[in-house]
Amino acid sequence: RLLSGGEKARLVLARMLYDPPNFLVLDEPTNHLDLVTKEMLIRALGGFDGTMLLVSHDRHFLAALTNRVLELVPGDPRVYAGGYTEYVAASGHEAPGMRSA
C-alpha cells in the first residue's frame, strides 16, 4: 500500500520530533518584530547548535549571527569567510542607501 500525502507528512513530522534537525532556513525572520523581541531571537539563535541559512535585510541581525556569507551573483556565486561585517569590508558592498557621502 502506498502512503497518502498526509501520511507522508505525518511520517516526516514524527521523524523530526524523534531526531531534531540541525539545519534552519530563516527568511526575513525579524520582519515585524520590535527591538526587544529581535534581541531575544538573536540570543536564542546564537545558542543554536547547527547550521542556519539566513535571508535578511537586517544588517544588525546578520552581523550578530553570521560567520560566512554566500553572495548570489548570476553565474558566479561567491563565498566570503567571516560574518556580514567582514563581507562588507572584503566585497565593498553595502546595503542600499547606506553609503557614506
Regions found by a protein language model. Give the residues of each.
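ABC ATP-binding cassette signature C-motif
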Residues: 1-101
